[in-house]
Amino acid sequence: RCRATCILVDIGGEDKVQYIAKVLKDDTNELVRHEAAFSLGQMCYSNGIVPLEDATKNDPSMFVRHEAAIALGVMGSKKVRETLENALNDPDKPVRDSAVVALSNLEFMEKLSKNEKFAKLTGG
């Protein structure tokens, strides 16, 4: 199932997000769900945000919550700030630490996007 998730990422396309999100939500194996969270972060499609937020808040595995928080930070969307701030209160330290890293990444991306030279180079 991990390999299948990776193959979907390699094939690419926003239409694959729904399938990876289903794996993140429903798979019984925390390693597979962790891989799905990582994959959604790497894909960086906005329709991956809600499944990652849900996993950050609700997955029973600290391992998955940690990866979902990191993935949200990688995506760099301001929309996830509240979810990450709430994750600072997670009962597990690795999740709290991941939220700190993710929030730092959001701040970095925000500052970078305000840089005129960077904006010209990236078309934004």
Per-segment meaning from a language model:
Residues 28-29, 60-61, 91-92:
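Short inter-helical turns and helix N-cap capping residues of alpha-solenoid HEAT/ARM repeat scaffolds
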Residues 2-10, 22, 28-35:
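Acidic (E/D-rich), amphipathic helical modules within compact regulatory domains
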Residues 73, 78, 97-100:
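Long, ordered, amphipathic alpha-helical scaffolds
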Residues 99-108:
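TPR/TPR-like alpha-solenoid helical repeat scaffolds
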